[in-house]
Structure formats: C-alpha cells, structure tokens
Curated annotation (Swiss-Prot):
Enzyme class label: hydrolase
Protein name: Endo-1,4-beta-xylanase A
Gene3D superfamilies the UniProt entry points to: 2.60.40.290, CBM10, Glycosidases
Signal peptide bounds: 1-26
Gene for this chain: xynA
Catalytic activity as recorded in UniProt: Endohydrolysis of (1->4)-beta-D-xylosidic linkages in xylans
The protein's Enzyme Commission number: 3.2.1.8
One GO BP annotation of this record: xylan catabolic process
GO MF entry, a single one: cellulose binding
UniProt entry tagged with the keyword Disulfide bond: yes
PROSITE patterns with a match to the protein in the record: CBM10, CBM2, CBM2_A, GH10_1, GH10_2
Pathway involvement of the protein, from the record: Glycan degradation; xylan degradation
C-alpha cells in the first residue's frame, strides 16, 4: 500500500531501482513493481521505492532491461537509454524520508511478445516485492483502496505514515537550498522551506515549499526543524483530529493571503466542497507561478478543477500516455489542502481529442476502453470525483458540424463509433472498475434553463439509473447571466434531478455570472468598456444578488447529504474564458483584476452563512 506522501508526490512508478552510491550507506528500500493496465499490444505499469531505512534518501537512479518489450513513454522521472534503460529523480521527488515512498510510471510496447516483468536491480533495494499484474480493465487493489476520501483524512494519513524524524534525516535537505539543514514540519509532514517566498506556500526548484513565517506560525510541536531549531517531528501528531488539522491549515493559509479581508475562507462556511478552476498551462493565471492566486486558493477553497490539463488530449504525448503535467497539479493540490475534481474523462471537441479518437480508427472501442481504464486507474485515490462524460447532449448553440440531435444526444465521434449513447454507460462502468472510490458525474451546460435540454438530461440520467450504470451525481455547469435564466427555472431544473434518485448528488461545476447579455437584443444595457465595472457599477450589485440566489437555491433544493459541491470557473475576472465574449468585456468571477474580492464574493458568503 502506498503512503499518503507517495500520493502527494504524484505517483505511478517504474521498473528497477538503484540509488546513487554516495547515499547508499545505512539506507535500504523496497522496490515493488506492478502492471496496472494491460491490452493486446502494450501495458502501463509502475514501481514504488519505499525508504525502509533510518535516514533520508537524497537522490535516486534506476535501471532495467527487457527481452522484447520496449519503453514507449514515462512520467515523473528522467529516463535515458534504449534498452537497457536508466532513470533518475526529478528535482521535486528525489528526497525520500524514512517510511515514505516515491514512484514514477511508464508505458511499454510488447513488440509482439507478452508483458515482461524484469528483475528489480540496484543496491538500494534491500527487498524487491514480487511483480504483480492487473488484467485489462482492472485496477490494483492497493491503488483502489489506499486513498483518503477527504482533505482531512489525507492529512491524517500522511501524518500517520510519517515516522519521527531523526537529526540525520532532517540534515538531508535539497541541494542548493539556502535553508541549510532546516525543513518545515507541517502538521507532522516534512516539506522544504522556501528560499524566496516570504508568505504562505510557494513553488521553488520545481516543487512546493513553505515560507519560514508560515511554518513558524504553527502551534507546537510543529514548525522549523533541523540545525538552529530544536522542534522535533512528533509522532503524536497522528492523534490530531481531522477537524483540528483542517482548521489549523485554513487558519494558517488564510493569514498568508493579503487579498482576502475576512481571513475565514468560503470553504469554512460549507460542509461540502467549495472549489475553483485553476489554469496550469502558463500565462499570468498559472497556479504554479502566481503566488497571489495560490494564496487565494489556499485561503478560500478546498477543491480544485483543472481548466484544461486533465482533459483527454492532455493525457498524451503523441500516441503515448503522459501524466507529468497533471501529476504535478494533483501533487500541488495534495500539498495545499485541496481535493481534486477531475475534468474530464470523455469530451467531444476536435481540438481536445487524442489522436486515436477519429471516425477512421478501426480500434476505436479498444482505445476508448484503454483511455478510461488507464487514466482513471492512474489517478485512483488521488482524485475525489470525475466528470466522466462531459456535454454528451445536443445543443443547437454548439453544433459546429451541423449534425443535429439524435434523440437529444450530440452526434459526437463517440456517439458515431458506438452507434448510440452506450459509450456513456461504458465510460461510467470502466471508471468505477478502475477507481471504486471516486464520485462519478455526468456534466453539461444550459441544463439549468429548465427547457428541452433539461428534459434530455432527465431522460439520460433515468436511462443510466434503469440500466444499473454507476452514476453518482449530475453536474450543472451554471454558466449564467445576471438576468438569465430565471432563478425559478434554475430551481426547477435541479429539483428534477433530485427527484430521480434518493442518492444522486448535485454539483455546480463551472459557475460564473456574466454582467452583459449579448442575446437580449438591447445593446443599450451593455457595459462596453473595460473600466465600466473595474471598481463599481450597478451590474456588480446585481451580480452579487445573482450569486447569492444561486447558492441559496442550491442549499434549499439539494438535501445536505447530496451536495457534491460548488465550483467557480476561475479565480479572478482576467482568468475567465468570458473576460471578453462576443466583443464585449465582462467581469464574471468573485475576484477582480487586482485579485480583490468583489461584491459577488460577499454574496456567496451571505448565502453560505444563511444571511
């Protein structure tokens, strides 16, 4: 079973382990190898290196060799060679504390043979766990059962699996760090201290770190450890309750954010996930490089959704799986008190499709199954919930090929290859088999209008329920305007889904509220200049009321045990896909261009607080 720390490092491992000679003294590790998903021509697998010694391992390398199989891709390691192969750690996963693990993954071409399981070599591996394999469409039980189901349990699990750290292990800090031999004992788990970041969490040397001031602000016995500090890592930290840990993390994170006046955070006002979509593909809004946005996420939210990098095409490099970018984001989430809502396993736009998803592919169904099996299994235990299928219903406003409706369904490449909507059933069944613990959602837009598309949604969900398909919830994207649709229709649309099953969850997945309505035929109402609502305008006041009434409707219509959460589709206005829409500026989110909370933010606070 993998430790919580292994997951936070972004796991899925490789084959064969040997560590650099200068770190070998008094260090032992077990190296376990698994085939996680196998198909006719290849497979994906992983190996995990677990430090069983008493001192930290600081830097590792691995090597292995096949008979006929050949490596086609890998992630979370630097790989070289063409059989034999060698791999070494990246900058962020080279340090393995006692009792902790790191791992990286691979995809292999069988080259006409069977799946090989080469010997695990290397002097660091004192014990090699026998190789195991998972047949096609299955997932290792160690992956499926080892994951915490909430932020709190993730933190507790991480603390429970961390051994008390000796001075020798503390001394092995990252090379190049001006922190010397010091690290941060963050509620029972060791993290690097930041060099340049002065508040909160940072991203330096390709990994997360904690600012000295934030680390030192924790209550005893936590804080800075190592040379110059006598604060130990106490094994008793595992006895902390989940509520006290989450409360402490929120308190510390909130105090580091200069852009949020309340200091409490939206997530502290709800007993269900309050999430936000984050960009992770470069630019000013990139969560990895914008410390101000990181502060907002830590202070306000407890769940993130990737805007793009967990969509279908982003899981590949050419025809091979590649999880490096998505693993980095999932790791960041785990290290920053966030769960992850995966978006999305299946989505139709041509610009978001992998190479295999075409009408001409004779092996389409096999590749479809391999995609669901591999991606869902890879993130098993790390992703709390998935949009399994996104936007499978027809919408006249989004029909670029002019194919029209097929009994309410979009005639996507998936629909065409399967000859109907059964691909939806298949996707849910395979996702459940690959990750039994994740919540599985169907997600779509304009379904809150309570019109024909809402009826199509009801029919789709009812069909899935009748067929025993393992659907856990329905996502309403909720891209709305200040004046459309009516709150009465939003309520009725959600109520129709609530009525379908006593266990079905409802999640608002992509909430934003436009001030301008380009469809109302009255341009005199439009705000046309970027400065019109930069600070204040009547539209911002209406937007506050709109956010408030939507959250209130959600709380009143959806029973407490069936609230999957509310996610806002972006952190600040300039991050939004609607910042300029149909030649009009807009201000659709909770924070403005200066990353300050808007009236809309207060509207959400009031709704969650019952005011």
């Amino acid at each position: 079973m993998r430790t919580a720390m292994a997951k936070s490092l972004g796991a899925a491992a490789f084959l064969g382990a040997a560590l650099f000679a200068h770190t070998l003294a008094a260090q032992t590790a077990t190296c376990s190898y698994n085939i996680t998903n196998e198909w006719n021509t290849g497979y994906t697998g992983d190996i995990t290196i677990t430090n069983r010694g008493s001192s930290a391992i600081n830097g590792w390398s691995v090597n292995w060799q096949y008979a006929t199989n050949r490596l086609s891709s890998s992630w979370n390691a630097n790989v070289s060679g063409s059989n034999p192969y060698s791999a070494s750690n990246l900058s962020w996963n080279g340090n393995i504390q006692p009792g902790q693990s790191v791992s990286f993954g691979f995809q292999v071409n069988k080259n006409g043979g069977s799946a090989e399981r080469p010997s695990v070599g290397g002097s660091i591996c004192s014990g090699s766990v026998a190789s195991s394999s998972a047949p096609a469409s299955s997932v290792p039980s160690s992956i499926a059962s080892s994951s915490p189901s909430s932020v709190a349990s993730s933190v507790i699990s991480s603390m429970a699996s961390s051994s008390p750290v000796s001075s020798s292990s503390v001394a092995s800090s990252t090379p190049g760090s001006s922190s010397g031999n010091q690290q941060c004992n963050w509620y029972g788990t060791l993290y690097p201290l930041c060099v340049t970041t002065t508040n909160g969490w940072g991203w330096e040397d390709q990994r997360s770190c904690i600012a000295r001031s934030t680390c030192a602000a924790q209550p005893a016995p936590f804080g800075i450890v190592g040379s110059g500090s006598s604060t130990p890592v106490s094994s008793s930290s595992s006895s902390l309750s989940s509520s006290s840990v989450v409360s402490s993390i929120r308190s510390s994170s909130s105090s580091s954010s200069s852009s949020v006046a309340t200091g409490n955070g939206l997530a502290s006002l709800a007993d269900f996930p309050i999430g936000v979509a984050v960009a992770a593909s470069g630019g000013n809004a990139d969560i990895f490089t914008s410390s101000a946005r990181q502060n907002i996420v830590r202070a306000e939210f407890n769940q993130i959704t990737a805007e793009n990098i967990m969509k279908m095409s982003y899981m590949y490099s050419g025809s091979n799986f590649s999880f490096t970018n998505s693993d980095r984001l999932v790791s960041w989430a785990a290290q920053n008190g966030q769960t992850v809502h995966g978006h999305a396993l299946v989505w139709h736009p041509s610009y978001q499709l992998p190479n295999w998803a075409s009408d001409s592919n004779a092996n389409f169904r096999q590749d479809f199954a391999r995609h669901i099996d591999t991606v869902a299994a890879h993130f098993a235990g790390q992703v709390k919930s998935w949009d399994v299928v996104n936007e499978a219903l027809f919408d006249s406003a989004d029909d670029p090929d002019g194919r029209g409706s097929a009994n309410g369904y979009r005639q996507s490449v998936f629909y065409r290859q399967f000859g109907g909507p059964e691909y939806i059933d298949e996707a849910f069944r395979r996702a459940r088999a690959a990750d039994p613990t994740a919540e599985l959602y169907y997600n779509d837009f304009n379904t809150e209008e309570n019109g024909a598309k809402t009826t199509a949604l009801v029919n789709l969900v009812q069909r899935l329920l009748n067929n025993g398909v393992p659907i856990d919830g329905v996502g309403f994207q909720m891209h709305v305007m200040n004046d459309y649709p009516s709150i009465a229709n939003i309520r009725q649309a959600m109520q129709k889904i609530v009525a379908l099953s006593p266990t079905l969850k409802i999640k608002i997945t992509e909430l934003d509220v436009r001030l301008n309505n380009p469809y109302d035929g009255n341009s005199s109402n439009d705000y046309t200049n970027r400065n019109d609502c930069a600070v204040s305008c009547a539209g911002l006041d209406r937007q506050k009321a709109r956010y408030k009434e939507i959250v209130q409707a959600y709380l009143e219509v959806v029973p407490p045990g069936r609230r999957g959460g509310i996610t806002v589709w972006g952190i600040a206005d300039p991050d939004s896909w609607l910042y300029t829409h149909q030649n009009l500026p807009d201000w659709p989110l909770l924070f403005n261009d200066n990353l300050q909370p808007k009236p809309a933010y207060q509207g959400v606070v009031e709704a969650l607080s019952g005011r």
